[in-house]
């Protein structure tokens, strides 16, 4: 594993951030529309 083969930290942060935003967004959207069941 060379330093070039490693995934940049900012890419990991962006992917994780988008994942969290998507999950939270779907949860609040489901709750707002009345379709979201309590997790």
From Swiss-Prot:
UniProt-listed InterPro entries: PSII_PsbJ, PSII_PsbJ_sf
A Pfam family reported for this protein in Swiss-Prot or TrEMBL: PsbJ
Bilayer disposition of the protein: Single-pass membrane protein
GO BP, sorted A to Z: photosynthesis
Sorted UniProt keywords: Membrane, Photosynthesis, Photosystem II, Reaction center, Thylakoid, Transmembrane, Transmembrane helix
GO cellular component terms attached to this protein's record: photosystem II reaction center; plasma membrane-derived thylakoid membrane
Annotated disulfide bonds: none
UniProt-annotated location(s): Cellular thylakoid membrane
Domain of life of the organism encoding this protein: Bacteria
Function per UniProt: One of the components of the core complex of photosystem II (PSII). PSII is a light-driven water:plastoquinone oxidoreductase that uses light energy to abstract electrons from H(2)O, generating O(2) and a proton gradient subsequently used for ATP formation. It consists of a core antenna complex that captures photons, and an electron transfer chain that converts photonic excitation into a charge separation.
Subunit structure: PSII is composed of 1 copy each of membrane proteins PsbA, PsbB, PsbC, PsbD, PsbE, PsbF, PsbH, PsbI, PsbJ, PsbK, PsbL, PsbM, PsbT, PsbX, PsbY, PsbZ, Psb30/Ycf12, peripheral proteins PsbO, CyanoQ (PsbQ), PsbU, PsbV and a large number of cofactors. It forms dimeric complexes.
Family: Belongs to the PsbJ family.
Name of the protein in its database record: Photosystem II reaction center protein J
Organism for this UniProt entry: Synechococcus sp. (strain JA-3-3Ab) (Cyanobacteria bacterium Yellowstone A-Prime)
């Amino acid at each position: 594993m060379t330093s070039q083969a490693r995934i940049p930290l900012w890419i990991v942060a962006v992917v994780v951030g988008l994942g969290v935003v998507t999950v939270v967004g779907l949860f609040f959207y489901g709750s707002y529309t009345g379709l979201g069941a309590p997790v």
